[in-house]
């Protein structure tokens, strides 16, 4: 069986005799697309991968249409790490760096004084925001505690980030006791112990069915149809134009003069360039029409 068939997929599964549910996700091309236009240090790349997997696993627990933003803000050299995902498993991520970053830096050294913020935004209904202390060695451990505290359910979160066959990969598993109260703590602990034995080459390189069999071959596991995951930025010429109009006219004229009559707006997330000349900006102001581009 070709392991690549389960790249960029999210699977849900149920341990039928244990009243415990699970999720498994692996990001391959999605992770590559996210990193594509950036040259992040390895430690930042790995942190973004960890946060992306966590966001995918979080969005899979939503019982409504909407999106989740997982964000770290601090006063260290990594000022911001942000991941946004929705119920369609479309995801994007970015980081902002201000200072020197070494690959041997701990999470605390990267972030300094900071917090982890989770914002859940349903398409209908009120937004919810949770603020989590970054008081553990990894984001995964901080988020695992968040899951357990917010849902009052035993939860295991396991995330690995690295390389497989020379390409970046991020993968993770979530285990959670069912909310109906029918599961026992002993059953959960037994499955969590099995889950913790997973090797990098297994979580990175096996198809879902084979991975689950390897870990839980004595269990009855019902595996549901997967959901595809993809990188999706959502930027557009129109959005860039709207942002440009927030700048005052004198400053726009100055930028146009400095850059040979064309302003280059680059998306911070995906790196796409949007170009605006004087004519395009005037049209934006007067009519709200989509701007004319110059390349």
UniProtKB/Swiss-Prot annotation:
Keywords: Chaperone, Cytoplasm, Disulfide bond, Redox-active center, Zinc. One of its GO terms (cellular component) is cytoplasm. It comes from the Bacteria. Its main location: cytoplasm. One of its GO terms (biological process) is protein refolding. Under oxidizing conditions two disulfide bonds are formed involving the reactive cysteines. Under reducing conditions zinc is bound to the reactive cysteines and the protein is inactive. CDD domains: Hsp33. It is found in: Cytoplasm. One of its GO terms (molecular function) is protein folding chaperone. Coiled coil: none annotated. Disulfide bonds join 233-235, 267-270. Belongs to the HSP33 family. Redox regulated molecular chaperone. Protects both thermally unfolding and oxidatively damaged proteins from irreversible aggregation. Plays an important role in the bacterial defense system toward oxidative stress. NCBIfam families: PRK00114.1. This is 33 kDa chaperonin. It comes from Mannheimia succiniciproducens (strain KCTC 0769BP / MBEL55E). The gene is hslO.
């Amino acid at each position: 069986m070709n392991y690549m068939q389960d790249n960029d997929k999210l699977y849900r599964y149920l341990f039928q005799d244990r009243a415990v549910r699970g999720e498994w996700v692996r990001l391959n091309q999605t992770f590559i697309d996210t990193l594509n236009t950036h040259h992040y240090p390895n430690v930042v790349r790995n942190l973004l991968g960890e946060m992306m997997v966590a966001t995918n696993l979080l969005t899979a627990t939503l019982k409504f249409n909407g999106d989740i933003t997982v964000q770290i803000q601090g006063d260290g050299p990594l000022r911001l790490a942000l991941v946004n995902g929705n119920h369609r498993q479309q995801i994007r991520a970015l980081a902002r760096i201000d200072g020197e970053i070494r690959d041997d830096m701990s999470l605390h050294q990267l972030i300094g004084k900071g917090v982890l913020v989770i914002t859940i935004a349903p398409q209908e209904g009120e937004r919810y925001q949770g603020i989590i202390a970054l008081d553990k060695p990894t984001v995964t451990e901080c988020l695992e505690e968040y899951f357990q505290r917010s849902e009052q359910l035993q939860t295991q979160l396991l995330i690995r980030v690295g390389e497989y066959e020379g390409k970046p990969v991020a993968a993770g598993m979530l285990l959670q006791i069912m909310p109906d109260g029918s599961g026992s703590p002993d059953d959960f602990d037994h499955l969590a112990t099995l889950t913790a034995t997973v090797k990098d080459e297994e979580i990175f390189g096996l198809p879902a069915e084979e991975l689950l069999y390897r870990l839980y071959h004595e269990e009855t596991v019902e595996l549901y149809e997967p959901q595809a995951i993809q990188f999706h930025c959502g930027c557009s010429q129109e959005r860039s134009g709207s942002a440009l109009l927030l700048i005052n006219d004198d400053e726009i004229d100055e930028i146009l003069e400095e850059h040979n009559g064309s302003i280059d707006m680059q998306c911070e997330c995906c790196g796409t360039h949007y170009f605006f000349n004087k004519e395009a900006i005037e049209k934006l102001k007067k009519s709200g029409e989509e701007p004319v581009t110059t390349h």
